[in-house]
Amino acid sequence: DDKFITTDYLQQCPCLVITAIPGVPAADLSGADLLKAWPSMGQQLGAVHSLSVDQCPFERRLSRMFGRAVDVVSRNAVNPDFLPDEDKSTPQLDLLARVERELPVRLDQERTDMVVCHGDPCMPNFMVDPKTLQCTGLIDLGRLGTADRYADLALMIANAEENWAAPDEAERAFAVLFNVLGIEAPDRERLAFYLRLDPLTWG
């Protein structure tokens, strides 16, 4: 398991310095235990977001990720398993066009809310102490880079859905996460945009 420590340069090449961390994946927790761990998970993600954008040598900005989506779709390589059920029968070019229509607004938002993002903050990548239910760190940093913080938040929220035992747990987790991060007015449309983009960038 890996934990992000810092970025450094080795012979002029950017690299990550990492170390092993203890714990179990948050994906293995029950809904009740995940809810207890959730505030510390939000804090860990917030710690990544607080890193210096100027000192991060990796970037995954929206323009770059949309370019990746264009490439994936052009090769007809979108993995249908990554799509929500309602999108599985939609032509890939239509899915891409839907994202493209929102690009101007989302690019403007990114300019004012750029952070260092984990890139794939799904439940298997949060490590949690099973006794204290405190998050011990994040692993799988292959997509770490500068981006709109909502790209991370959308994935974290969506990927936790299958862990919740009831809808009220999901709503409580949503409120807790944005409270921990100090975001007073969560933008649900912005979250939805990044959920529509993400499946198009794998392939």
Q: Model-flagged regions — what are they?
A:
Residues A151-P186, L195-G203:
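Active-site activation/catalytic loop segments of kinase-like enzymes and analogous catalytic loops
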Residues P25, F126, T146, A158, ...:
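Conserved protein kinase catalytic core
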Residues A37-P39, Q43-G119, P186-D187:
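An alpha-helical support segment within catalytic cores of ATP-dependent transferases
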